[in-house]
């Protein structure tokens, strides 16, 4: 994924139309009234000149540099909805040293979090999810056992802006995860997840022939691909294809927990089988999603509504507290297994030298 040499250099743009001073006064506040409001002298207004190729280079140079930088990431998050971005926010605050790539199939990130239920504006979060809002500095109405954000888009835009300000996090939107990179551990002979296979989301596999994808290696994948839409619960469905062994889904997975200095391993991929999401029950669903957020198979943490497809738990919409706090718990789960998975990957193919 190394960019072409031409794009690694930094060409100096010498294009110049001998413009007049570009320091034009634009004031976004005016105390004038009755037809005298003026934010700028629009008759004299003019943008600084630019050559079209300058715009192309400004975009492509940075995008190719990001592809090169994040081809080897510490963490890959699949899905930029409320759970995925909440996890990214928590990870970014706690570990600014880690490279974190977020892969989102939609052109517009945010998942189903731009509106509340049935296209209504307000967002409801049951307590104690309000503590996550407090950390972001987001206003809400306190209704006792729950809080209300006046518009779901306010929550999502605030969260997204904070995540994208972290220098160690890159969002690749309009990019789809097509498959998972797997590794077989020579010590246990079991598979684990070690990255993702990506492609442009707009490609049509039915009508185009050459569709080879690209890859991102990482130590832990966090999947938050939801349950609706063409890519809903993608990772969980792919795991079932990789595993195929029958299993009693009511038994639950082995939850990784640090009881001693050694981490308890989750179940192998060969034991994985979808539970299938059940009907709506808010009181059961939100607790189940947060408590169940974990490393489901080695190298893969699943959070948010995708987890309902894994465990066979209930859906809970339209309340969003579990999405935010599932993201927080997912960040915790990722950090608790990160070093172990890194050591395993280095033992398999050696440490990354880039």
UniProtKB/Swiss-Prot annotation:
Any one Gene Ontology cellular component term annotated for this protein: cytosol
GO MF term list: cysteine-dependent adenosine diphosphate thiazole synthase activity; iron ion binding
EC number in record: 2.4.2.60
Subcellular location: Cytoplasm; Nucleus
PTM entry text: During the catalytic reaction, a sulfide is transferred from Cys-210 to a reaction intermediate, generating a dehydroalanine residue.
CC cofactor: Fe cation
Protein family (similarity comment): Belongs to the THI4 family.
Subunit structure: Homooctamer.
HAMAP family assigned to the protein according to its UniProt record, in alphabetical order: THI4
This protein's name: Thiamine thiazole synthase
Originating organism: Candida albicans (strain WO-1)
């Amino acid at each position: 994924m190394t960019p072409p040499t031409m794009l690694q250099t930094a060409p100096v743009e010498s294009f110049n139309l001998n413009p007049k001073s570009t320091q034009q006064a634009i004031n976004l506040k005016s105390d004038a009234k009755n037809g005298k409001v003026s934010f700028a002298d629009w008759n004299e207004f003019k943008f600084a000149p630019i050559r079209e190729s300058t715009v192309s280079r400004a975009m492509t140079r940075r995008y190719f540099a990001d592809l090169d930088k994040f081809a080897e990431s510490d963490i890959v998050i699949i899905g930029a909805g409320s759970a995925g971005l909440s996890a990214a926010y928590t990870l970014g605050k706690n570990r600014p040293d880690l490279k974190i790539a977020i892969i989102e199939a939609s052109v517009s990130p945010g998942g189903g979090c731009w509106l509340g239920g049935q296209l209504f504006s307000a967002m409801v979060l049951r307590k104690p999810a309000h503590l996550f809002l407090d950390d972001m500095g987001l206003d809400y109405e306190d209704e006792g056992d729950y809080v209300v954000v006046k518009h779901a888009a306010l929550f999502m835009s605030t969260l997204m802006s904070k995540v994208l300000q972290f220098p160690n996090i890159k969002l690749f939107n309009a990019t789809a995860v097509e498959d998972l990179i797997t590794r077989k551990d020579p010590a246990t002979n079991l598979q684990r997840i070690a990255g993702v296979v990506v492609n442009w989301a707009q490609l049509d596999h039915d009508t185009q022939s050459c569709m080879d994808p690209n890859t991102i290696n990482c130590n832990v994948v966090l999947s938050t691909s939801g349950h609706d839409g063409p890519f809903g619960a993608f990772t969980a469905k792919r795991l079932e294809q990789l595993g195929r062994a029958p299993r009693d889904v009511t038994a639950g997975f082995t939850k990784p927990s640090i009881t001693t200095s050694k981490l308890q391993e989750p179940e192998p991929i060969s034991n994985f089988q979808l539970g299938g999401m059940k009907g709506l029950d808010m009181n059961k669903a939100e607790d189940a999603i947060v408590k169940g957020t974990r490393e489901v198979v080695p190298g893969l943490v699943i959070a948010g509504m995708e987890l309902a497809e894994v465990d066979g738990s209930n859906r809970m919409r339209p309340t969003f507290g579990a999405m935010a706090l599932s993201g927080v718990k997912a960040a915790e789960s990722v950090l608790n297994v990160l070093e172990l998975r890194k050591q395993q990957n280095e033992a398999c193919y050696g440490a990354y030298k880039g």
